[in-house]
């Protein structure tokens, strides 16, 4: 089999946020904050398979918030070095980092030295009041996003703002243009626009997603804007399209659903390693398992 992407699962379902569209995040407690043991033998198998597929990027991701497990991130980075992936990314909301820089200073230095190249920051907008409603509804305010960007850049990381596009948050051309301008002003290297997944994977999110997903018309307007205002750079099959919009790298991403599945074993989308040693090619379909 051959794959386009390699994802490595960090931590547990524990997350300090309670995003209504979330796949599986739950409130941290004594049990889910305990690190799980990693099957390093099977990570090597997954890494070798990723190398055979010609994958150039490994994404450290989570069912919850990975930065709640900083030591595990460090260990993963050390074990992944032997596979020599050019790009090593961490997907996070980065809120724990923004709220406790003193704690994460040493980890960020370690991660950079151990090969982490890119941190992707999950948001729903560039506007703090909108992000607060989704990510920090029980707090007085959202984190200072421009300050976080500047802070992470100071360690040498490349950054990507990944926006989950929802109704009344990121649903118009004007909002998208404002978001792109925000990224450019703050020297963010990459932007990803990802419409919230129509095929909800958590029953509790079903009603919210139905009410807050973008319409087909809204998606088309955003796509046409990017094509008119920008230059198409890359077409990544079943992943998305990358544009240059006034000097800003912007990816219009395709959500994981039946339309991004290919039954050709030489054209699988995602190779996924779980800490218990299971290696899968589907996030939600239990039958999509290799080991």
Q: What spans do the regions from the language model cover?
A:
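Short Fe-S-cluster ligation motifs
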Residues: 42-63
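Canonical radical SAM enzyme core domain
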Residues: 29-45, 66-118, 123-130, 137-144, ...
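Hydrophobic faces of well-ordered beta-strands that scaffold small-molecule active sites
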Residues: 5-8, 58-60, 88-90, 119-121, ...
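Radical SAM enzyme core and accessory elements
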Residues: 1, 262-291
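Acidic (Asp/Glu)-rich catalytic clusters
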Residues: 48-52, 82, 108-115, 149-156, ...
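Canonical Radical SAM [4Fe-4S] cluster-binding loop centered on the CxxxCxxC motif
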Residues: 1-42, 53
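Short loop/turn motifs at secondary-structure junctions
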Residues: 18, 54, 84, 115-116, ...
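Radical SAM enzyme [4Fe-4S]-AdoMet core and its adjacent flexible, acidic
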Residues: 31-34, 129-134, 138-143, 150-262
């Amino acid at each position: 089999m051959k794959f386009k992407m390699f994802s490595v699962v960090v931590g547990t379902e524990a997350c300090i946020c309670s995003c209504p569209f979330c796949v599986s995040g739950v409130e941290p407690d004594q049990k889910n904050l305990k690190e799980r043991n990693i099957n390093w033998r099977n990570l090597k198998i997954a890494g070798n398979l990723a190398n055979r597929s010609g994958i150039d990027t490994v994404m450290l991701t989570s069912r919850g918030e990975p930065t709640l497990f900083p030591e595990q991130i460090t260990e993963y980075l050390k074990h992944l070095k032997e596979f020599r992936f050019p790009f090593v990314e961490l997907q996070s909301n980065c809120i724990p980092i923004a709220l406790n820089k003193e704690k994460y200073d040493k980890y960020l230095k370690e991660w950079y030295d151990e090969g982490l190249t890119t941190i992707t920051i999950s948001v729903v907008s560039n506007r703090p009041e909108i992000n607060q409603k989704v990510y920090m509804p029980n707090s007085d305010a959202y984190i200072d996003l421009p300050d976080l960007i500047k802070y992470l850049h100071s360690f040498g990381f490349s950054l990507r703002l990944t926006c989950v596009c929802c109704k009344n948050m990121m649903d118009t051309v004007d909002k998208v243009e404002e978001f792109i301008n925000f990224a450019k002003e703050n020297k963010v290297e990459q932007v990803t626009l990802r419409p919230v997944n129509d095929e909800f994977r958590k029953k509790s999110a079903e009603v919210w997603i139905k009410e807050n997903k973008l319409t087909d018309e809204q998606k088309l307007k955003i796509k046409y804007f990017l094509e008119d205002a920008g230059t198409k750079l890359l077409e990544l099959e079943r992943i998305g399209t990358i544009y240059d919009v006034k000097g800003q790298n912007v990816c219009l991403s395709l959500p994981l659903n039946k339309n991004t599945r290919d039954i050709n074993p030489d054209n699988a989308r995602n190779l996924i390693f779980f800490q218990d040693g299971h290696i899968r090619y589907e996030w939600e379909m239990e039958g999509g398992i290799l080991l």
